[in-house]
């Protein structure tokens, strides 16, 4: 019976405590529930100085980052880390779940290729607004959105947190299928 089989899920996001935002909270909650009820969760996120990951009941693997908080409010992860790849490979991951369509999903795609496991992406927010706030050139905004949509389109399955988020994703040019999967919903068999 597959429903009772324990799974190992790798959750990847560009934000995680000490940064607090809605997506970081969702990832923390996903990881806690998976770890408590369904198997093993591993969170992969950029390095932040003074982060205390020992408080979590699941491992948090951090990879190198650069400080771009003045530009976008976050540290930008540098996902080309052989050490991180080896650490994740050692966790025997069954599923990768990315929550940010930029660095996290680039890393998730590299891990999927290496581990041969499915990649789910959740679209949480209107990234076109974030891009417009961070990049003032219209041409660069359009190129960034195109890359974002290509990154999302490369995932095996796409979830959105609401119908409105799905419509926003479509308005950016995404043409694939998506499943509305509201945060905070626990699926029981």
Segment roles from a protein language model:
Residues 153-162, 179:
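A short beta-strand/loop micro-motif in the catalytic core of glycosyltransferases
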Residues 87-89, 150-151:
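Structural alpha-helical scaffold elements that stabilize or flank donor/cofactor-binding regions
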């Amino acid at each position: 019976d597959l429903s009772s089989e324990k799974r190992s899920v790798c959750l990847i996001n560009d934000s995680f405590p000490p940064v607090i935002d809605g997506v970081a909270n969702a990832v923390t909650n996903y990881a806690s529930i998976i770890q408590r009820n369904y198997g093993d969760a591993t969170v992969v996120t950029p390095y932040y100085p003074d982060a205390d990951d020992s408080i979590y009941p699941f491992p948090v693997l951090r990879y190198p980052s650069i400080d771009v908080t003045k530009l976008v409010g976050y540290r930008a992860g540098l996902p080309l880390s052989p050490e991180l790849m080896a650490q994740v490979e050692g966790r025997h991951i069954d599923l990768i779940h990315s929550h940010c369509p930029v660095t996290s999903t680039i890393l998730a795609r590299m891990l999927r290729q290496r581990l041969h496991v499915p990649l789910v992406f959740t679209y949480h927010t209107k990234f076109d607004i974030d891009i417009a706030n961070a990049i003032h050139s219209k041409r660069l905004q359009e190129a960034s959105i195109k890359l974002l949509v290509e990154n999302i389109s490369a995932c095996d399955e796409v979830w959105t947190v609401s119908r409105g988020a799905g419509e926003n994703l479509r308005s950016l040019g995404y043409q694939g299928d998506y499943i509305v999967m509201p945060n905070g919903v626990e699926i029981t068999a």
